[in-house]
């Protein structure tokens, strides 16, 4: 028997034709306002049937917008779950899918996300393929929005303990994803969500990602890729390769965001110069309210070589230790100050041969000038 989600075609993809498909080229969806389940491979349909939400079970409230991005929009929605009843959800529309292969990759990511079950990881309710339009991602509604906006809110007065506690929750979620061999690639405070109980959920991976925000830049070697440069590990900036250890680096930046109540990292550094800056041994400074022990944990996340960085399991233990050592209630205001502006780089500079050519030339010019 057919699954309820597959009883009839929900969408029709207008492909570029059999010739293009047969030639191995990407199949372009000429009319991106409509797309067909029959165009998907049968084996993929069999895999994806468990994540499909029938169109009649989803109401998208398009007049109630949660947010908009270049990649799509997010709306309030109601999912009529056959077991749990009506659920308040977030519905993300995708406007930028133009190839059939992208739709299939999208659905494979949905299969992967549906398998995540952890209190600190945002779950996927399902994917809807409407009769008219492109796929919709259905996610639980997060009442308090993203972590960065939450800690930046003027009306809130989070304590150091509370902020570190948020970081610990993120570390727990990332520990789970690392055990699942899943690399996030875009870990940042803006990509973690808070529900009504202030439980932090690691989010914005896979289907939920929108990489067209102001925090994303093209870098010289990859002009067409939009990357979260200020959160990226040194080796990722150099090779555009990501691992769990590069996620650990990003986690260190996230902790810095929390202890500065959402300040932007490296505001004085041009995004095109990030690799050069880091190769000099420089890192983010210690926020004034940040305990020395916690800053030591951050620095360990930013070790030059991935092997030197802790695991997420190790970070969970370290953060629990830091929290246990704190006494009293310390509040952080929005004026960001630092305690180590006069100190030198925390790591030695890379050998001259590893610096960009222009950097070596600048060093030579400085020596001549002296």
From Swiss-Prot:
ATP binds at residues 66-74, 92. The modification Phosphotyrosine is found at residue 216. GO terms for cellular component: plasma membrane; receptor complex. This protein is synthesized as an Env-Sea polyprotein. It comes from Avian erythroblastosis virus (strain S13). It catalyses: L-tyrosyl-[protein] + ATP = O-phospho-L-tyrosyl-[protein] + ADP + H(+). PROSITE patterns: PROTEIN_KINASE_ATP, PROTEIN_KINASE_DOM, PROTEIN_KINASE_TYR. GO terms for molecular function: ATP binding; non-membrane spanning protein tyrosine kinase activity; transmembrane receptor protein tyrosine kinase activity. Keywords: ATP-binding, Kinase, Nucleotide-binding, Oncogene, Phosphoprotein, Transferase, Tyrosine-protein kinase. This is Tyrosine-protein kinase transforming protein SEA. InterPro entries: Kinase-like_dom_sf, Prot_kinase_dom, Protein_kinase_ATP_BS, RTK, Ser-Thr/Tyr_kinase_cat_dom, Tyr_kinase_AS, Tyr_kinase_cat_dom. Residues 60-323 form the Protein kinase domain. Pfam families: PK_Tyr_Ser-Thr. Its EC number is 2.7.10.2. GO terms for biological process: cell migration; cell surface receptor protein tyrosine kinase signaling pathway; phagocytosis. Residues 345-370 are annotated as: Disordered. The active site is at 186 (proton acceptor). Residues 357-370 have a biased composition (Acidic residues). Belongs to the protein kinase superfamily. Tyr protein kinase family.
């Amino acid at each position: 028997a057919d699954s309820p989600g597959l009883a009839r075609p929900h969408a029709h993809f207008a492909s570029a034709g059999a010739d293009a498909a047969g030639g191995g080229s990407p199949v372009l969806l000429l009319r991106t306002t409509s797309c067909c389940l029959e165009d998907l491979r049968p084996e993929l349909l069999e895999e994806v049937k468990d994540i499909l939400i029938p169109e009649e079970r989803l109401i998208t409230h398009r007049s109630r917008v949660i947010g908009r991005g270049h990649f799509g929009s997010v709306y309030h929605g109601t999912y009529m779950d056959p077991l749990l009843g009506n659920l308040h959800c977030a519905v993300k529309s995708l406007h930028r899918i133009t190839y059939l292969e992208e739709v299939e990759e999208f659905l494979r990511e949905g299969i992967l996300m549906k398998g995540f079950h952890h209190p600190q990881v945002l779950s996927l309710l399902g994917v809807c393929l409407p009769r008219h339009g492109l796929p919709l991602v259905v996610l639980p509604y997060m009442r308090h929005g993203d972590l960065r906006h939450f800690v930046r809110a003027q009306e809130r007065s989070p304590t150091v303990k509370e902020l570190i506690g948020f970081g610990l929750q993120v570390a727990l979620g990332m520990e789970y994803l690392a055990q699942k061999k899943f690399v996030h690639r875009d870990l940042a405070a803006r990509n973690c969500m808070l529900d009504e109980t202030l439980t932090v959920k690691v989010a914005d991976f896979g289907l939920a990602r929108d990489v067209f925000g102001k925090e994303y830049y093209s870098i010289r070697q990859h002009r067409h890729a939009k990357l979260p440069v200020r959160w990226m590990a040194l080796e990722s900036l150099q090779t555009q390769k990501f691992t769990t250890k590069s996620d650990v680096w990003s986690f260190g930046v996230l902790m810095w965001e929390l202890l500065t109540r959402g300040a932007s990292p490296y505001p004085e550094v041009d995004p095109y110069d990030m690799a050069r800056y880091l190769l000099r041994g420089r890192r983010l400074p210690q926020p004034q309210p940040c305990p020395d022990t916690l800053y030591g944990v951050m620095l360990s996340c930013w070790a030059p070589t991935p092997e030197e960085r802790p695991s997420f399991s190790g970070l969970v233990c370290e953060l629990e230790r830091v929290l246990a050592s704190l006494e009293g209630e310390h509040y952080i205001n929005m004026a960001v100050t630092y305690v180590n502006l006069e100190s030198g780089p925390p790591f030695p500079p890379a050998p001259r041969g590893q610096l960009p050519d222009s950097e070596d030339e600048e060093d030579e010019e400085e020596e001549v000038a002296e």
